[in-house]
Amino acid sequence: MATLLSNGQQSVMASTSNGQEQQRHQDEPEQQQQVEIRKSSSPKPGAMPSLKLNRMGSVSPKDKRVYKIVLTGGPCGGKTTGQSRLCTFFENLGWKVFRVPETATVLLSGGVKFSDLTEKEAYKFQENLIRTMVQIENTYFELGNSSNRNCLIICDRGVMDASAYISKDKWEKMMAGNNWNPVEMRDNRYNQILHLVSAANGAEDFYSTEDHACRSEGVDLARELDYKSAAAWVGHPYFDVIDNSTNFETKMNRMIESVCQKLGIDIGDRLQATSRKLKYLVALLPPDSEFPPFQDFDVVHHYLQSAGPKVQARLRKRGQKNHWSYIHTQRRPNVHGQARIEVKTQLTHRDYMNLLAQRDDAHFTIYKKRRCFLINNQYFQLDIYKEPGHPRCKGLVLLETYSSLTGDALKNCMPKFLNIVKEVTGDPDYSMFNLSLKEDWSTTKKFCRSATHGKQEEQSPVPAKQYHPYDENSD
């Protein structure tokens, strides 16, 4: 029932503030700039931040970014080392790095034992722990917002980790009593979640409890805690699982690469990044009972008028039970030698409504149900297209994931309960940009093609300045 006590590693904990954080997002202009595989900067179609690795010192308020990540995972997953590596890497780039201590470890090291508490006392302690976590994080978040430098805030576990150590009924009661909701606690509070898989799952020879005073789990319990902590974050739009399929050094590099990729920082081959987005066509979905635990979201995409053929912009509205998050994505190819950059900005509802005036009439609005789930240490997003929309989207279901695996290793981690028709990675026929076009593909000049995938080889090459939608991330 404890909250994230299994790994006393230092990284920043993120969590949501009771109602106040949500109100702040509604009332203030959003100042968090994020560049993720699709994340960062201003929603203005023409503005693009510099992403040079050697940017040092202060930055202009317009370009400044405050990026909040959660390091989570099972016991002996590498969070302490990972936090240190992230800190060193980003400080070398000139960023200010804040490290929020793990609240559970701080409180439990003061003599608290759950075995000594009554059920009522344990519930109240857990609730106060989360409130404390929220306040500690808010202190660091405000420091990040007031700094004149780009800031990375590393949270050693976040609020949703607490749900792994408490019953569903008690968790929902606690959320309702504090005016919390999953969209604010899980999706809007943090920019990215990094789950470092426990050594007990895939690297058993290296599993140890010797270096942590609050850790005593055996291998089987460590595996269980690892799964629970990952399941707690299913549904976050930018959730990366860093498994033990490589040696530890490469695992750390993959973690750093994941953050850099989502921030839009060009690292070249410094970390030998191999992870890539994969997309699959799926037919005839099975009953919900065949899925592992999942989170469903309503998602709405609007393409916007852009400043030119090299720029593409869109809005995304994503939510559950009438709680929403809003993201603006601006995409430009060939920035500072990078193949593609997607700049994402978290928006307030007011900013979102204002930007809707820039909708591109050449595109349908895209409506989806998005199902997020975790299986075989792999995070998947299943997009089920809904009406209204173009007839070409009727019944369309696409599965997406990010992986560095290939061959049989990749095949073995895919969900066996889904009827996967074929891989469509890079196929422009399944690009959201093309799927949303109102004009017929055979006559429109807006259809974007690629000469790198299957049947596209028979088509004319892409003009040099044209946006490549098959590289896009569907948010």
UniProtKB/Swiss-Prot annotation:
Top-level taxon: Eukaryota
Chain positions covered by the region annotation Disordered: 1-59, 452-475
Alphabetic keyword roster: Cytoplasm, GTP-binding, Lipid-binding, Nucleotide-binding, Protein transport, Transport
Effect after changing P75L: Lack of GTP-binding, defective light-induced internalization of TRPL, late-onset light-dependent photoreceptor degeneration and larval lethality
Molecular functions per Gene Ontology: GTP binding; phosphatidic acid binding; phosphatidylinositol binding
Amino acid composition bias (Polar residues), ranges on this chain: 1-19
Gene3D superfamilies, sorted: Hypothetical Protein Pfu-838710-001, P-loop containing nucleotide triphosphate hydrolases
A GO CC annotation given for this chain: cytosol
SUPFAM superfamilies with a match to the protein in the record: CYTH-like phosphatases (SSF55154), P-loop containing nucleoside triphosphate hydrolases (SSF52540)
InterPro entries reported in the protein's UniProt record: CYTH-like_dom_sf (IPR033469), NadR/Ttd14_AAA_dom (IPR038727), P-loop_NTPase (IPR027417), TRPL-trafficking_regulator (IPR053227)
UniProt main location, coarse: cytoplasm
Protein's cellular compartments: Cytoplasm, Cytosol
Expressing tissues: Isoform A: Expressed in the head. Isoform B: Expressed in the head.
Gene Ontology BP terms: photoreceptor cell maintenance; protein transport
Function summary: GTP-binding protein which is required for the light-dependent internalization of the TRPL ion channel from the rhabdomere on the apical surface of photoreceptor cells to the cell body and for the recycling of TRPL back to the rhabdomere in the dark. Binds to 3-phosphoinositide (PtdIns(3)P) and phosphatic acid and so may interact with membranes, particularly the early endosome membrane where PtdIns(3)P is predominantly localized. Plays a role in preventing photoreceptor degeneration.
Name of the molecule in the record: TRPL translocation defect protein 14
Lineage, broadest ranks: Eukaryota, Metazoa, Ecdysozoa, Arthropoda, Hexapoda
Gene this protein is translated from: Ttd14
